[in-house]
Amino acid sequence: MEMQINVNTKIIYMDSAVPVMRAIENVKRDIRKVCCDSDEKGCDIVLIMENMQAEQFEIKCDNNMLVIYASDTLGFVYGLYHISRDILGVLPFWFWNDQVFIKKKGCRISGEYAYTSKPYAVKYRGWFVNDEVLIHKWYVDRKKDMPWEMVFEALLRCGGNLVIPGTDKNSHIYRDLAADMGLRITHHHAEPLGAPMFARRYPELTPSYDEYPEKFHELWKEGIDEQKKLDVIWNLGFRGQGDCPFWDNDPRYQTSESRGELMGKLIGLQRDYVQNEIPDAQYCTNLYGETMELYRDGYLKLPDDVIKIWADNGFGKMVTRRQGNHNPRIPALPKENNTGRHGIYYHVSFYDLQAANHITMLPNKPKLVHSELKKVLEHHVKDYWIINCSNVKPHVYYLDFIANMWRDGDVDIDKHLKGYIASYYGEDHITEIAECFR
C-alpha cells in the first residue's frame, strides 16, 4: 500500500537526545519546504531503538508508518537525513547551492520501501572550518549562528561525525553547537587540546615553553576542563603561535634532536592531563610539515594509542607542504611496518600566506584527488579523515566528492560529476558544466 509524507506527517521519538531532536526539527522544516497544505493523511515517521552497529540505521514501512531503527544518536540522525534526501529530495548542500523547491501535496512512498545503511569506509569523518572569512561575520535570518548550523547540518548530511568548528576564537564559540547537532569535536594542530593560544592570552610575553611552562600547562588544563563533557578526539602537539614551527618563537632549539625531544615530552604530558580526567579518551596528532620530518627521521616518539594524522601539501598531493623556500615533497603516508591507527588532514581549501584557494575551488582535477585518496585507502589510512573545508560554499563539489569516498571507499568520477550537476543545476547543460569541473 502506497504512503506519503506531507505536512500532516508526524515524527514520533520517545527519547530526548538533543542531536536527534534537532534533526527532527530540520526534517519538519524540509517537509514544509517541499510540501504544500493538504487535507490528506500523511504517514508518521517513527524512531525505534534497535540493537545495531554504531551509526547504522534501517528504514521500513509498517502499517502507514515509516520506521527508522537505530541503536544510537547518529544512527537516527543519519536515518532522518536519508529520508530527507531520498524521499523529500533535499540535497546535502541544499543551502549552499541554493536548491530550488517546487511544492507538491506530498511525497509518495511505496509500501515496500526499505533501506539498510552500511558501515562507512572511514571511521572518523569530518571537516575543519578554517580561514572562514566568508562565514564568521555573516548573519542568516538575522542569526549569527545560522551559517555555522548550516555547515554542521551539511556535514551530517554527508555522513560526517567529526568537526574542527572554526579557527582560533570561533572554534571555542561554536563547539557546543556542533556537539548539540551530534558531531564529535577535534582540534587544529596549532591549538592542541582546543586550548586558548598562548599569544592570545599573553600577547606581551614570548611564547616560549622553557620560559613559561606553567602558563602553557594552565592553558592546556583549561581546554580539557571546558570540553571534558563533550565527545572529543583530543589533538596533541606543539606548534608555534599562528601555525608555524615552535622554534620560530623560541630559537634556542636548533637541532632536530632537541626539537623532537621537546615535542615528544609535551605530547606525553598533554596525554597524561587528559587521561587523568577522561580514562577512555581518544587522541590524535598531526604529522604536518616539520612534525612529519621529525617523526620520519626518528626524532619524535609518539604514544601507541595516538592516531597519526598525515597531511597533503595543501593542494591535494600527499607529500609534505612547502614552508617558505623549504619544499622537500617527502611522501606523506605511513610505511607498511608503521602500526597503529592512521588518518589524514586533506585540503580542498588552503591558505598558507604564500598561496591560497580558500575563496576559490581547489585548482586541481578530480582525478588527482581520487588518485590520492585511493592511495590513502590502499595504505589502510581509514581511522580518521579531516577535510579543510574553509568557507564551504566554494568547495561544495569536492566536499560532496570526498563524502562519497569516505562512505564507499571509491567513487566513479564521471558518474558522480554528472549526478552532482544534474541534481543541483538540472539536465540541460551537463556536458558544458562538467568541463568547468574537469
Task: Please report, for each region that a protein language model flagged, where it lies by residue.
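The substrate-binding groove and active-site-proximal loops of carbohydrate-active enzymes
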Residues: V67-A70, N130-D145, C158-G166, A199-H217, ...
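Hydrophobic or amphipathic alpha-helical targeting/insertion segments
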Residues: N64-V100, N170-A195, R201-E226
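An acidic-aromatic substrate-binding cleft motif
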Residues: L91-L162, G340-I344
